[in-house]
């Protein structure tokens, strides 16, 4: 084998010659190989060992230029357009030959590609350096098939070139700042270097685990721009003021004790801390406070005053007359029976256990009506009697048989409820006329809207507009097109109108042909009715529609209840006087459901006759109570006015035993600002004596308006101003006033 030196240049020569043999026009951009500067071939006679002079010199400037151009070609090959042309120049030539040499066809195709990308706004940093429209601008404008002054082509070319240049500038700007950012980074620490080395070794071993990037710690340094957020306002520096306290303090009146806080404030827990209403917690969510340990309190000093106060007090006033040793059961029973008799004599007493009076129908057998199924089902008209003059008054409340006249006082049964139903309802009826009107037929099943009685009807307020008659003057020229033109008004019914006209709006509820008379008939004995109305009075029942709401403000009610005939004050008086008619005959009966009987027929005296409480008729109402005489109660109708300043001066003059002139002189000295020796209380004085002396020293009007609370409030003000000491007496009946220390 020969030396390897001569064989290497031969191989390189052959490869280079083969590379040069391919024309540039036949190669595509993706397959194009750019020739690199090769070292000069060594002579064949030189031995295999190379000599330093045979190697080319290192050109740094040329290498920098090649690196810059390599980026351009990389961007060129990475573009999306497959037919995008790249510069065919070689990097081995000098700088003057960097402009690519394209044919006219390639220039035209390159121009159309640039205009298309510019129109679609797809020029980015990736393909901006591969578009050579700026380099071939002059050749494009000077082509033979176009005119030299084609401004449309020039404008489009200039617009696309501007966009390409702008994107190139942005790309260079971004690269520069990226390089500057890399220069500003600190040197990696030893831990990061070890981490990179470990990651590199892991990658070499075939692992695909990515290195965990360390989290960057962002240091936020915020400087407040608004100075008002740093400064505290004057309102926040002040103590929080309670609005309830402001309102209470503003309404404080020196002339009365209503504004004293001690009488209005409350305590919340055992600490007896006075709290304003705004500070009181209605529902406390915290744990309740534990009570402190109760210690012993020394009460030896209070023993004597408490014993003195307890001597004059009664332990139980209700048992003050009770004696343990001298108590007698007979005397006690007599007092109790006298008290019970006193209550029994009252007219308003009601005894639910009272015995019912015997019925006038003596021939009727005993027993309840519900158990007698064999009784006659037809109405019995013989029980009414021959007194026809009472028939017109008794028929509305008359029952069909004597057994039904006595209605039991059962709770919630039909026999208790039916007598309350009146077919001629009035203002004292149990049910309202409007509710009873629902049984008048299908037309009245719906409740009617309530009519306004006071307000005048709307039909009266609206004036009737006179409609002008339509006349046609045959002698006048009338434009019939105006009357027969097509208007904008709809000629068909709308959808909403058709929906409203449904069967509910045009059809009455189903009529079940319910007979109202069955409501007052018994189920097992239809012939017996609980209520029956005379045929002559059936027409009069229609007057309920005219009944208006009861006016409770009428003069009869507002002036001492309802005036009328007074009931007898005593149970022994005759009740027949209440039923005497205008002619002297008995026109009404205390028994509205029974025929009247004389005292001789009944066997009882007139005093024994009374109202039957078990008969509930419409006219048998409760008698009105005894009318109370109108008694005028005298009370203070005007507010008391008191000059507190003058009252304090008078009280202070009495405490210091000064005359009137001396008190006025002291007041003048105080107003002038002169310093004078403060007067002191001469001797101990009592509040009761001060009040009596004030009534004599004050003017008549002020003396009349003076009261104990006002005098005590004035004394409290003086005690605060003059340093007085107030002490209570042992029996707490008076206040002792003396000069403080």
Curated annotation (Swiss-Prot):
Ranges of compositional bias, category Acidic residues: 361-377
Phosphothreonine: modified positions: 49, 598, 605
Predominant location category: nucleus
Region (Disordered): 1-67, 361-383, 447-467
Chain residue numbers at which the record places covalent cross-link Glycyl lysine isopeptide (Lys-Gly) (interchain with G-Cter in SUMO2): 488
One GO MF term: chromatin binding
Residues where N6-acetyllysine is found: 637
Gene Ontology biological process: cell division; female meiosis chromosome separation; meiotic chromosome condensation; mitotic chromosome condensation; positive regulation of chromosome condensation; positive regulation of chromosome segregation; positive regulation of chromosome separation
Tissues where the protein occurs: Widely expressed at low level. Expressed in proliferating cells.
Compartments where found: Nucleus; Cytoplasm; Chromosome
Maturation and modification: Phosphorylated by CDK1. Its phosphorylation, as well as that of NCAPD2 and NCAPG subunits, activates the condensin complex and is required for chromosome condensation.
The family this protein is said to belong to: Belongs to the CND2 (condensin subunit 2) family.
Stored PANTHER family: CONDENSIN COMPLEX SUBUNIT 2
Protein name, per record: Condensin complex subunit 2
Protein source organism: Homo sapiens
């Amino acid at each position: 084998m020969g030396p390897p030196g001569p064989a290497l240049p031969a191989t390189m020569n052959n490869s280079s010659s083969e590379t040069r043999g391919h024309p540039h026009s036949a190669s595509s951009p993706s397959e194009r190989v750019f020739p690199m500067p090769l070292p000069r071939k060594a002579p064949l006679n030189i031995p295999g060992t190379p000599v330093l002079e045979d190697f080319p010199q290192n050109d740094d400037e040329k290498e920098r230029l090649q690196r810059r151009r390599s980026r351009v070609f990389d961007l060129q090959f990475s573009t999306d357009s497959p037919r995008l042309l790249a510069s065919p120049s070689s990097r081995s030539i000098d700088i003057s030959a960097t402009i690519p040499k394209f044919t006219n066809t390639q220039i035209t195709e390159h121009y159309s590609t640039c205009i298309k990308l510019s129109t679609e706004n797809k020029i980015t940093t990736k393909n901006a350096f591969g578009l050579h429209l700026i380099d071939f601008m002059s050749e494009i404008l000077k082509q033979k098939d176009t005119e030299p002054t084609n401004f449309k082509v020039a404008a489009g070319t200039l617009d696309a070139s501007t966009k390409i240049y702008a994107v190139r500038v942005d790309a260079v700007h971004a690269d520069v700042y990226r390089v500057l950012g890399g220069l500003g980074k600190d040197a990696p620490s030893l831990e990061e270097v070890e981490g990179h080395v470990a990651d590199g070794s892991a990658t070499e071993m075939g692992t695909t685990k990515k290195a965990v990037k360390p989290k960057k710690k962002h240091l936020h340094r915020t400087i407040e721009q608004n100075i008002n957020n740093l400064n505290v306002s004057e309102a926040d520096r002040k103590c929080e003021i309670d609005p309830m306290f402001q309102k209470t303090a503003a309404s404080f009146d020196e002339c009365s004790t209503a504004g004293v806080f001690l009488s209005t404030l409350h305590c919340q827990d055992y600490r007896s801390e006075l709290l304003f209403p705004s500070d009181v917690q209605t529902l406390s969510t915290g744990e309740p406070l534990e009570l402190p340990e109760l210690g012993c309190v020394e009460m030896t000093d209070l023993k004597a005053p408490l014993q003195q106060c307890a001597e004059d007090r009664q332990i139980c006033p209700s048992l003050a007359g009770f004696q343990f040793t001298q108590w007698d059961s007979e005397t006690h029973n007599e007092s109790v029976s006298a008290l019970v008799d006193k209550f029994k004599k009252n007219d308003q007493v009601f005894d639910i256990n009272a015995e019912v009076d015997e019925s006038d129908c003596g021939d009727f057998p005993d027993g309840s009506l519900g158990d007698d199924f064999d009784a006659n089902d037809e109405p019995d008209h013989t029980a009414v009697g021959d007194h026809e003059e009472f028939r017109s008054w008794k028929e509305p409340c008359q029952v069909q048989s004597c057994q039904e006249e006595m209605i039991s006082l059962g709770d919630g049964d039909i026999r208790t409820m039916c007598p309350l139903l009146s077919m001629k309802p009035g203002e004292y009826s149990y049910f309202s006329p409007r509710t009873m009107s629902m049984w008048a037929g299908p037309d009245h099943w719906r409740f009617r809207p309530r009519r306004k009685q006071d307000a005048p009807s709307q039909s009266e307020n609206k004036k009737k507009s006179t409609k002008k008659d339509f006349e046609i003057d045959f002698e006048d020229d009338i434009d019939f097109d105006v009357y027969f033109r097509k208007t904008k008004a709809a000629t068909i019914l709308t959808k909403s109108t058709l929906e409203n006209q449904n069967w509910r709006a045009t059809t009455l509820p189903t009529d079940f042909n319910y007979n109202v008379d069955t409501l007052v008939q018994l189920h097992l004995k239809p012939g017996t009715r609980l209520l029956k109305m005379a045929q002559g009075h059936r027409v009069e029942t229609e007057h309920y529609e005219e009944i208006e709401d009861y006016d409770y403000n009428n003069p009869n009610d507002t002036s001492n209840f309802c005036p009328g005939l007074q009931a007898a004050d005593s149970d022994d008086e005759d009740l027949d006087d209440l039923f005497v008619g205008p002619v002297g005959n008995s026109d009404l009966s205390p028994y509205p459901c029974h025929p009247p009987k004389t005292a001789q027929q009944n066997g009882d005296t007139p005093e024994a006759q009374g109202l039957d409480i078990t008969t509930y008729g419409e006219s048998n109402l409760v008698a009105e109570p005894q009318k109370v005489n109108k008694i005028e109660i005298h009370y203070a109708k005007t507010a008391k006015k008191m000059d507190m300043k003058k009252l304090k001066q008078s009280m202070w003059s009495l405490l210091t035993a000064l005359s009137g002139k001396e008190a006025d002189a002291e007041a003048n000295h105080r107003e002038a600002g002169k310093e004078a020796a403060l007067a002191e209380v001469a001797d101990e004085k009592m509040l009761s004596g001060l009040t009596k002396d004030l009534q004599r020293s004050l003017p008549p009007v002020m003396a009349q308006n003076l009261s104990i609370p006002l005098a005590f409030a004035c004394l409290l003000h003086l005690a605060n101003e003059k340093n007085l000491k107030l002490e209570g007496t042992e029996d707490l009946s008076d206040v002792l006033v003396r000069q403080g220390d």
